[in-house]
């Protein structure tokens, strides 16, 4: 009986030892970019125009975060292009897209600009129509950019189109009239 108790005690100590986190082990910091890169749009594509533009905004915010590294920028660029309409993707190679993006990010970082927050049109403000180009939606994204202590708002108007799988894809965007 005493031998059984001893064996159980040794087993409990062993289990506790292997399940105790190592205080010296490297910890992985979960950044916004890391979280964004774990998303799988093939399995869980955003369902509405607003959700697609929200994903675009989240990725954009990650691009300009100083903690986002070069490999993450490439991965985020891949993700962003999954939100784009085929015609938009066809207008620029991936390499050109990433080169242009990195150049813009470098300018933002050198000027210490940061996207602090954003807002997307409410669902009731999304305009939808069907015409010879397909089913389209128009909505707005406002990026709040912190620049030298001030917050500057950049308002963009987005055009999205449903593809053959009924996924909303970004056809393009332009700077909107600033109010």
Regions found by a protein language model. Name each.
Residues 10-15, 36, 73-74, 90-97, ...:
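Short low-complexity stretches enriched in small and charged residues
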Residues 22-28, 151-179:
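Short beta-strand edge/turn micro-motifs at domain boundaries
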Residues 33-110:
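Core segments of small alpha/beta cavity-forming domains
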Residues 52, 137, 154-156:
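Hydrophobic core residues within well-ordered beta-strands of beta-rich domains
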Residues 101-146:
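Surface-exposed, charged secondary-structure patches
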């Amino acid at each position: 009986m005493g031998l059984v108790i001893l064996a159980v005690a040794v087993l409990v100590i062993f289990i506790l030892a292997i399940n105790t986190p190592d205080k010296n082990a490297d910890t992985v910091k979960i950044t916004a970019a890391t979280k964004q890169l774990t998303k799988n749009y093939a399995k869980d594509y955003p369902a509405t125009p607003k959700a697609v533009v929200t994903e675009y905004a989240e990725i954009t915010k990650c691009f300009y975060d100083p903690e986002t590294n070069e490999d993450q920028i490439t991965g985020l660029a891949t993700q962003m292009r999954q939100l784009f309409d085929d015609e938009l993707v066809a207008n620029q190679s991936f390499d050109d897209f990433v080169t242009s993006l990195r150049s813009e990010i470098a300018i933002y970082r050198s000027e210490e600009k940061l996207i602090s927050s954003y807002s997307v049109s409410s669902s009731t403000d999304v305009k939808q129509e069907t015409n010879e180009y397909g089913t389209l939606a128009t909505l707005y994204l406002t990026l709040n950019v912190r620049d030298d202590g001030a917050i500057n708002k950049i308002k963009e108007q987005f055009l999205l189109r449903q593809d053959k799988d009924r996924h909303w894809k970004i056809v393009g965007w332009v700077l909107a009239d600033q109010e």
